[in-house]
């Protein structure tokens, strides 16, 4: 755990220490480039997922000088001048010389005896006033001709535009030594931000605040879940509130429709038709394009049951970011009440009675991630897929989904996940088993449970996983 920067949270008037946690694989990849005199890397991911911090961490022990430039939403010449100003400040260029292109700047750097680590952050901003093809061609030429003593790190938050750089038709195709799509931290890694908490509380903290390092650094593990919510997401002066209200979708051109889509999905309207009807877009046909754009931003995702992988009728959408989901479930439509009541009263009126249900749904995702980690670490074998499972119980005239299912060669392992504050009872396990056995044609392997507060009994016919096991991989 390493301190990498320091901020002052104006909300709580206390210092917030930004810690570096996780990212071992990504660090290993980027650090390997430091063994070469010349390299190029592309790092992309949604806002505040830790791209810049990762790059700076990878470069902090390099003997070569680092140059960091964050691009502006401005004409190309302004960005060239800004980049040169950074080089002057770092004493790489003696004075502010009048370069007319990025090519000329990098050609000049090639004449120097030193090796440089150069970070071009928010690369898509260079395309604000210049055609994307032109910008990409410029950097293709730079990588091909002018980085013999440069390790170039190109980073960006506009995921769709960054992905385009990897397409065969793009000028930069095949130019990067490595590329990394940086995702949110998983529940296990995030638990390092609040190590002293009980497992029951760790589940709740991740369910609400999610996997952004930027957000997790704002949390105080000495405080309760309620207190952390009040101090951050219910405080309009907090940068956490700003993250949910506008920062995450600041690059999206139709923010209002994005908000309406998030609100619909976060409040149970997860099927395409349901979202379409909720937004009144049924006759326009625009929803599909808007969902595609938000998918490209890594904010929402499509979810198919593992036994219905291409069935559009069974397709549902979910908001991937836990904190964003929380904001649109509880706060978005009630902002005026938050202003009138204050954070504590708002929590008691609008959140307190429903928060356990909210956490329970996210606990299911934690459980699926747990099994995924077990497979990746080779602690669990013979699993071909992990997800939800759609069932049609014709005998009882009902259908639904099992939320945590492992697909094996000839059967499915089915797990029920319970976020209870008390131990799970045997009677409830038996009732869950009856429901599973009632489904005709379902080949069942294991029936199991994951209970946040343990079990009254752990009979041998069931696989009973203790919540502690999720955090001891």
Where are the language model's segments positioned?
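Phosphate-binding site recognition
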Residues: 1-345
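A cross-kingdom feature that marks ATP-driven nucleic-acid transaction machinery
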Residues: 15, 42, 315-473
């Amino acid at each position: 755990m390493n301190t990498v920067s320091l901020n002052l949270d104006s909300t709580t008037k206390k210092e917030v220490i930004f810690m570096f946690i996780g990212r071992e694989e990504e660090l290993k990849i980027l650090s390997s480039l430091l063994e070469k005199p010349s390299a190029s890397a592309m790092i992309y991911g949604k806002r505040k997922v830790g791209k810049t911090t990762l790059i700076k961490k990878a470069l902090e022990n390099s003997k070569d000088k680092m140059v960091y430039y964050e691009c502006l939403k401005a004409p190309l010449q302004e960005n060239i001048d800004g980049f040169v100003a950074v080089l002057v400040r770092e004493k790489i260029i003696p004075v502010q010389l009048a370069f007319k292109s990025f090519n000329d700047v990098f050609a000049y750097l090639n004449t120097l005896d030193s090796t440089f680590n150069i970070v071009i952050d928010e690369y898509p901003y260079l395309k604000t006033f210049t055609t994307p093809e032109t910008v990409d061609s410029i950097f293709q030429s730079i990588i091909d001709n002018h980085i013999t003593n440069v390790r170039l790190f190109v980073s960006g938050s506009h995921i769709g535009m960054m992905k385009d750089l990897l397409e065969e038709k793009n000028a930069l195709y095949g130019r990067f030594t490595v590329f990394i799509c940086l995702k949110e931290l998983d529940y296990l890694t995030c638990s390092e931000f609040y190590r002293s908490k009980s497992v029951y509380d760790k589940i709740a903290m991740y369910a609400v605040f999610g996997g952004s390092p930027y957000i997790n650094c704002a949390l105080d593990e000495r405080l309760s879940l309620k207190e952390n919510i009040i101090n951050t997401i219910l405080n309009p002066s907090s940068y956490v509130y700003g993250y949910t209200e506008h920062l995450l979708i600041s690059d999206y051109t139709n923010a209002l429709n994005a908000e309406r889509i998030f609100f619909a999905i976060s409040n149970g309207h997860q099927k395409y038709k349901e979202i379409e009807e909720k937004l009144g877009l049924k006759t326009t046909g625009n929803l599909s394009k808007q969902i595609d754009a938000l998918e490209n931003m890594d904010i929402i995702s499509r979810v198919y049951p593992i036994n219905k992988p291409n069935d559009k009728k069974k397709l549902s959408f979910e908001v991937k970011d836990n904190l964003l989901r929380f904001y649109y479930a509880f706060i978005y439509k009630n902002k005026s009440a938050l202003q009138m009541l204050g954070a504590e009263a708002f929590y008691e009126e609008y959140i307190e009675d429903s928060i356990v249900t909210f956490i329970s749904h996210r606990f299911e995702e934690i459980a699926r991630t747990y099994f995924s980690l077990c497979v990746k670490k080779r602690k669990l074998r013979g699993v071909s897929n992990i997800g939800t499972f759609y069932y049609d119980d014709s005998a009882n005239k009902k259908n639904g989904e099992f939320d945590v299912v492992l697909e094996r060669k000839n059967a499915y392992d089915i797990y029920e996940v319970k976020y209870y504050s008390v131990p799970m009872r045997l009677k409830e396990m038996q009732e869950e088993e009856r429901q599973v056995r009632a489904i005709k044609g379902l080949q069942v392997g294991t029936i199991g449970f994951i209970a946040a507060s343990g079990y009254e009994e752990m009979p041998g016919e069931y696989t009973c996983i203790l919540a502690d096991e999720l955090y001891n991989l």
